[in-house]
């Protein structure tokens, strides 16, 4: 007989820490979408009408989890804009290849530099995105990164 221990959740990765923010940007890499989905559901359930940008990087469209859930959220959250970037999808007609500073600058060009930014994904992606965001004028105190690797 096996035993399973469940512990947590831990940490403070939440949009609620930025209650004064008028705009949110969520940047996720792969399964880093998990906490973003939870926050978006909370925002939808509470009738949040702030401007939201979700930038989600995946290898291919087949790696997009729960597409129906995101369509439903987009219908509920009128301020939500979902941007996909595919890193390994040569046939994909949208944004392709890994995120880099020029792509991030272009994709977030209409976002306020005082927006709250939440980032979750692979370590190197989060490090790079943080540095690019700061270099693009986003406020350090408004950028929050969730590291989930050990």
Kindly label every feature range from the protein language model.
Residues 1-150:
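FNR/FR-type flavoprotein reductase catalytic core
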